[in-house]
Amino acid sequence: MSKGLPETRTDAAMSELVPEPRPKPAVPMKPIGINPNLLGYIGIDTIIEQMRKKTMKTGFDFNIMVVGQSGLGKSTLVNTLFKSQVSRKASSWNREEKIPKTVEIKAIGHVIEEGGVKMKLTVIDTPGFGDQINNENCWEPIEKYINEQYEKFLKEEVNIARKKRIPDTRVHCCLYFISPTGHSLRPLDLEFMKHLSKVVNIIPVIAKADTMTLEEKSEFKQRVRKELEVNGIEFYPQKEFDEDLEDKTENDKIRESMPFAVVGSDKEYQVNGKRVLGRKTPWGIIEVENLNHCEFALLRDFVIRTHLQDLKEVTHNIHYETYRAKRLNDNGGLPPGEGLLGTVLPPVPATPCPTAE
């Protein structure tokens, strides 16, 4: 080796002397809530507009069931709720000849459009409920119908050739009409709500509230709430499904006001220079949307304006999922039928349920 020149080393020797580089520490993630303007606009807020456009284009399903004895104004109230003739009143009949011998299920579909949004509404009526001398187990055909709609949706969901949007016939809401006796709930009322509250969103309402004084109405509402609590019956909105403190605060106010004491009417009258929906009595006009007269406006706002989407989500994520899990556990597999997947079911999405084509 020549003098004055540094000694050279081979690559192998160098690798022994130079240590392996240490891995770089992970770069900490930016904290949530950072100002997006510092990094540039992402566009995640457009999801709201995307959902709006899709809803405007396809519309959405809403299926409401009405249950109660005849003569409680079920059809009138539903027509008042949606300001349309969406439920047909039963024609006058000879009671001995025309009253159904068993509970019937009648579904009537309508499309209601408002502000460019289409709602595919189905009203499910239950003539014959509670009208017999012996009403034992008269809730069973109603529970059977509700479960049949879950089964229909389940079979579509696991089908290989499933549709992009599965037609949704599941019952999202059941209005249960309580007779305005002013005393207590009947055994039939308790039996129905005890069984059906496990499979559908039940909203109890006191029918024909104009037949009671304000004091009678207040006392009856408190008595009904107490009886439901004592019998372990939870109506919608269920406490266990409150998602946060804001939900709980809002829903507690609603639960304290239930059951809503309502009056329905499709007739208009002139009151103080304004046309209002109401019922004419010897004492004056009962205004349907006047909270001093009845609680129809509270029911309408609750079902349509604030909780409609939640009714659909609880149906899909709670009631349907409960049926789905039980159905598969009981049978040890998928429901029978052609073209069904032989593998594990896809997970239920935590999103609003699909709408009909």
Curated annotation (Swiss-Prot):
GO terms for cellular component: cell division site; microtubule cytoskeleton; presynapse; septin complex; septin ring. Residues 1-29 are annotated as: Disordered. The keyword Membrane does not apply. GO terms for molecular function: GTP binding; GTPase activity; molecular adaptor activity. It is found in: Cytoplasm; Cytoplasm, Cytoskeleton; Synapse. Residues 58-330 form the Septin-type G domain. Residues 125-128 are annotated as: G3 motif. Gene3D superfamilies: P-loop containing nucleotide triphosphate hydrolases. It comes from the Eukaryota. Keywords: Cell cycle, Cell division, Cytoplasm, Cytoskeleton, GTP-binding, Nucleotide-binding, Phosphoprotein, Synapse. GO terms for biological process: cytoskeleton-dependent cytokinesis; protein localization. Residues 1-10 have a biased composition (Basic and acidic residues). Its main location: cytoplasm. The modification Phosphoserine is found at residue 91. Residues 68-75 are annotated as: G1 motif. The keyword Amino-acid biosynthesis does not apply. GTP binds at residues 68-75, 102, 208-216, 264, 279. Coiled coil: none annotated. InterPro entries: G_SEPTIN_dom, P-loop_NTPase, Septin, Septin3. Phosphorylated by PKG on serine residues. Phosphorylated by PKG on Ser-91. Residues 207-210 are annotated as: G4 motif. It holds the Pfam family Septin. Belongs to the TRAFAC class TrmE-Era-EngA-EngB-Septin-like GTPase superfamily. Septin GTPase family. Septins polymerize into heterooligomeric protein complexes that form filaments, and can associate with cellular membranes, actin filaments and microtubules. GTPase activity is required for filament formation. Filament-forming cytoskeletal GTPase. May play a role in cytokinesis (Potential). This is Neuronal-specific septin-3. The gene is SEPTIN3.
